[in-house]
């Protein structure tokens, strides 16, 4: 912003600032963790937190006095039912989350302070949105030090998570909190992220500031609006018309509704001008229309990675009905009492879904996320690489999950030995690596190692000898125990046709390697797969010569 004002001080600026907080992983700075932990905000647990939040919402006028707190779900544990070990861990999870939120708020404050330092605060419209969906329950029932365990259907027991307790929130973890915290964070509503049928999965607080233009400073507005209303609000506020074409491409109409009318105190209780809105995700769906909401009851729980066949996406869902003008928390389901109203809104949902290309509906989860898509690697069983290669996404890498495979590397070792990565996929939170290591002190000629990292829960190693100068063929051959997700197997490491190590794994990664890692040949561009033994620092370039690396994939 400062540079823009220095280069072209007469021009207005637009800033879209979107920090990662508080999407998992929760990674605040240690200073913020210390500050929030010292405040003991979460020590009384999620049920008490929910009551406190709801009381504050009523005190501040965010929720009307007649609003009712929705019931706690039976699928999530009550705080008082937990043991001391569980409570201690869950408090730590929430403290790190709270620190991440406070850290982000502080940085947002710095941005606003910079606007004020430029002398432009009174001339700047600020729209602050407190999130992009409901709080996430994807940490499963116990939370996790590594969210990729969730994506692979692994629920890490509380006692095992204590290994990461001192490091929670640091680069040693990829953490998320327990699902019950998510439900509490969505107070007073039901449900969480992934469930757009209910306000717990969609409702966000919004604050707007524009001195001299918004007269009712500190005023509360309860009109229904949607994120698609942000652009129309900006266009009306600035007097700019939406472009009909961009780079020669005709633009679709803006479907949202400006919120500018709500700035007038006379319109504080006026009916919303955004009268109808559909919601849909993973088969969960709802329709808002003039103060009424019809919504499906979720068929699955977002804190469970279900492999079961989902119900029929049309006929397999129960519907609920709410008058949210009178019942803003969606407490009182009127579906049984008002079937005609429900039917009217159901028909409206399908009309809107047709209009806005929502159909066909799809309520699959794991299969939808992990569906093979058109790619250069689909259907291939052999891959050959020569020389250094980096940053290849998993979708374009050899797919070694849930099958037998062979990795063969032809390398040349110089005089004095070599070290470095030959080939790797994944990293600290799950993956594998074939590399040469001179150990912690960098001595020797370089020992050949294959390391498999099972989601940072267990590492299995195959260790061979130091390689003499000259040409060598290194082979790692893995035979899977059978079909199915995450099955184990036996791996054999060979050098120049001679077996040098054999080991077994009871389990392998079933669904996905970490999405923020990559497949690399000749170096490791992201985090390392090792932790203590054979630890290395990226990029860990191979100091010998790679002639060829070949993958052969089985069934």
Q: Could you say what each language-model-derived stretch is?
A:
Residues 184-203, 279-335, 341, 439-440, ...:
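C-terminal, low-complexity/hydrophilic appendages and adjacent surface loops
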Residues 1-73, 100, 104, 109, ...:
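Active-site regions of oxyanion-processing enzymes, predominantly non-cytosolic
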Residues 69-72, 81-90, 230, 294, ...:
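Long, internal low-complexity/basic segments
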Residues 421-449:
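Glycan-recognition/cleft segments
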Residues 468-489, 552-554:
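Localized edge beta-strand/strand-to-loop motifs within extracellular or lumenal beta-rich domains
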Residues 113, 148, 152-269, 317-320, ...:
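Substrate-binding rim/cap in mid-to-C-terminal beta-strand-loop elements of soluble/periplasmic
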Residues 503-543:
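Flexible glycan-contacting loops in extracellular carbohydrate-active proteins
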Residues 454-473:
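Short, aromatic/His-centered strand-loop micro-motif at the edge of beta-sheets
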């Amino acid at each position: 912003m400062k540079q823009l004002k220095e280069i072209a001080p007469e021009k207005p600026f637009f800033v879209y600032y979107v920090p990662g907080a508080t999407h998992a992983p929760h990674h605040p700075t240690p200073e913020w963790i210390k500050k929030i932990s010292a405040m003991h905000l979460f020590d009384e647990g999620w049920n008490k937190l929910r009551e406190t939040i709801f009381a504050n919402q009523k005190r501040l006028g965010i929720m009307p006095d007649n609003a009712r707190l929705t019931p706690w779900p039976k699928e999530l544990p009550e705080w008082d039912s937990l043991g001391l070990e569980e409570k201690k861990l869950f408090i730590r999870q929430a403290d790190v989350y709270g620190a991440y939120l406070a850290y982000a708020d502080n940085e947002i404050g710095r941005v606003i302070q910079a606007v004020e330092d430029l002398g432009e605060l009174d001339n700047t419209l600020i729209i602050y949105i407190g999130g992009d969906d409901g709080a996430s329950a994807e940490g499963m029932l116990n939370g996790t030090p590594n969210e990729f365990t969730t994506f692979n259907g692994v629920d890490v027991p509380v006692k095992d998570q204590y290994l990461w307790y001192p490091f929670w929130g640091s680069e040693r973890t990829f953490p998320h909190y327990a699902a019950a915290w998510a439900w509490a964070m969505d107070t007073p509503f039901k449900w969480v992220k992934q469930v757009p049928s209910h306000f717990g999965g969609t409702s966000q607080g919004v604050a707007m500031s524009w001195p001299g233009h918004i007269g009712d400073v500190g005023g509360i507005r309860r009109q229904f609006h949607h994120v698609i209303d942000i652009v129309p609000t900006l266009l009306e506020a600035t007097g700019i018309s939406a472009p009909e074409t961009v780079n020669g491409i005709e633009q679709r109409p803006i479907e949202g509704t400006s919120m500018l009318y709500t700035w007038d105190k006379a319109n504080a209780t006026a009916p919303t001008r955004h009268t109808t809105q559909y919601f849909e995700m993973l088969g969960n769906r709802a329709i808002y229309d003039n103060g009424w909401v019809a919504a499906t009851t979720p068929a699955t729980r977002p804190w469970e990675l279900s492999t079961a066949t989902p119900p029929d996406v049309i006929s397999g869902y129960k519907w609920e009905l709410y008058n949210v003008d009178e019942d803003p928390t969606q407490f009182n389901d009127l579906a049984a009492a008002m079937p005609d109203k429900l039917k009217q809104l159901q028909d409206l949902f399908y009309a809107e879904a047709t209009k806005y290309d929502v159909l066909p509906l799809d309520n699959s989860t794991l299969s939808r996320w992990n569906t093979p898509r058109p790619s250069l690697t689909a259907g291939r069983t052999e891959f050959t690489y020569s020389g250094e290669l980096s940053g290849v996404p998993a979708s374009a890498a050899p797919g070694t999950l849930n099958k037998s495979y062979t990795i063969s590397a032809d390398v040349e070792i110089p005089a004095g030995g070599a070290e470095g990565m030959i080939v790797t996929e994944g990293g600290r939170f799950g993956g594998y690596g074939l590399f040469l290591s001179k150990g912690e002190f960098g001595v020797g000629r370089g020992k050949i190692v294959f390391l498999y990292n099972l989601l940072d829960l267990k590492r299995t190693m195959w260790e061979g000898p130091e390689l003499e100068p000259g040409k060598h063929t290194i082979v790692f051959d893995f035979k899977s125990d059978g079909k199915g997700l995450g099955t184990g197997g036996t791996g054999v490491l060979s050098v120049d046709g001679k077996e040098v190590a054999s080991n077994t794994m009871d389990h392998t990664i079933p669904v996905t390697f970490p999405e923020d890692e990559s497949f690399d040949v000749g170096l490791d561009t992201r985090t390392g797969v090792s932790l203590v033994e054979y630890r290395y620092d990226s990029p860990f370039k191979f100091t010998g010569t790679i002639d060829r690396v070949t993958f052969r994939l089985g069934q």
